[in-house]
From Swiss-Prot:
It catalyses: a plastoquinone + NADH + (n+1) H(+)(in) = a plastoquinol + NAD(+) + n H(+)(out); a plastoquinone + NADPH + (n+1) H(+)(in) = a plastoquinol + NADP(+) + n H(+)(out). It is a multi-pass membrane protein. This is NAD(P)H-quinone oxidoreductase subunit 6, chloroplastic. The gene is ndhG. It comes from the Eukaryota. Its EC number is 7.1.1.-. NDH is composed of at least 16 different subunits, 5 of which are encoded in the nucleus. The chain crosses the membrane at residues 10-30, 32-52, 61-81, 92-112, 152-172. The keyword Transcription regulation does not apply. It comes from Olimarabidopsis pumila (Dwarf rocket).
Length: 176
């Protein structure tokens, strides 16, 4: 969207904080229904971020596929689960939680150091060369492919990681 700078920055901070709050809700809420609704909120915030960055097609695909199909499927599956195991015995901290938090914290600091040490100047020039190449393309699907592999590479990969985690979680729930 072509918004003035302060409004764009405010919406960016607002949606980013919504992502953080929703992500914490997914992880920390003990009731799986509330966690699934929080995941839906996170996915809607991501699609609004796509709209904010002028990628309306990806935002529509995000809403239709992830919020409209996958999140509804997760909520449907959670509602069929037996909720007695969540209400009776709820341990606040286990060894597995400690190991998981240690691994996630390590990955977070590695990602932060990688982001801070990356020369973003070269990435900007690569993007500009792709924009020059994009003017010669005829097909919109080719333009979408170029945007997904350059401008929106990180969000696209994050969405694929979220799907992978959801599949692993579904498999582990099905085994129990």
């Amino acid at each position: 969207m072509d918004l003035p700078g302060p409004i764009h920055d405010f919406l960016l901070v607002f949606l980013g904080s919504g992502l953080l709050v929703g992500g914490l809700g997914v992880v920390l809420l003990p009731n799986p229904i509330f966690s699934a609704f929080s995941l839906g909120f996170v996915l809607v915030c991501i699609s609004l971020l796509y709209i904010l960055s002028n990628s309306h097609f990806v935002a529509a695909a995000q809403l239709l596929i992830y919020v409209g199909a996958i999140n509804v499927l997760i909520i449907f599956a959670v509602m069929f689960m037996n909720d007695s195991e969540y209400s009776t015995d709820f341990n606040l901290w286990t060894v597995g939680n400690g190991i998981t938090s240690l691994v996630c914290t390590t990955i977070l600091f590695l990602l932060m150091s990688t982001i801070l040490d990356t020369s973003w100047y070269g990435v900007i020039w690569t993007t500009r060369l792709n924009q020059i190449l994009e003017q010669d393309l005829i097909s919109n699907s080719q333009q979408i492919g170029i945007h997904l592999s350059t401008d929106f590479f990180l969000p696209f990969e994050l969405i694929s990681i979220i799907l992978l985690v959801a599949l692993i979680g579904a498999i582990s729930v099905a085994r129990q």
